[in-house]
């Protein structure tokens, strides 16, 4: 009987060793294909995986794609490529980090969460309830896609100055440490 208990215990430990790594792998969030294809923002170099909650993917009618870290960089690309019409514009849902349709998303402008590449946050949500829940916690106002694009362009000058100042400070800090 004792040998049977030891054998069953050993078998249980062996099975755990086989099962647990697979379960742990299954629990890890899968990296979305757009992040694999466009790991960093071509404009600023930021990691799109790290900023999955704000990333954007623009698919143009000519078949080209642009993966940006944020609305800020996406509107810059659309402004530079005026002759290329976007066929599809996707954005990371703030809560789930999954890509959703940017034009039908419920957006929140402002609040106490600083934006990505922007002082004023501009966040996308799949549902109005999620956006309203964010507003209760962090403030801001509901907006549609047209309003958020307009806000991004309105903020462009001050955001660009802020980014330049940050980069200048980072460069000075790097120079100081070397």
Residue ranges and their predicted role:
Residues 92-155:
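Thiol/selenol-based redox catalytic cores and closely related redox-interacting motifs
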Residues 13-22:
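C-terminal segment of classical bacterial N-terminal signal peptides
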Residues 6-14:
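Hydrophobic helical h-region of N-terminal Sec-dependent signal peptides
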Residues 25-83:
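N-terminal secretory signal peptides
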Residues 1-4:
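Positively charged n-region of N-terminal signal peptides that target proteins for export
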Residues 139, 144-177:
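N-terminal targeting pre-sequences for secretion and organelle import
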Residues 65-111:
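Mid-chain, structured segments of secreted extracytoplasmic proteins
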Residues 37-39, 54, 64, 87, ...:
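Envelope-exposed proteins and targeting segments
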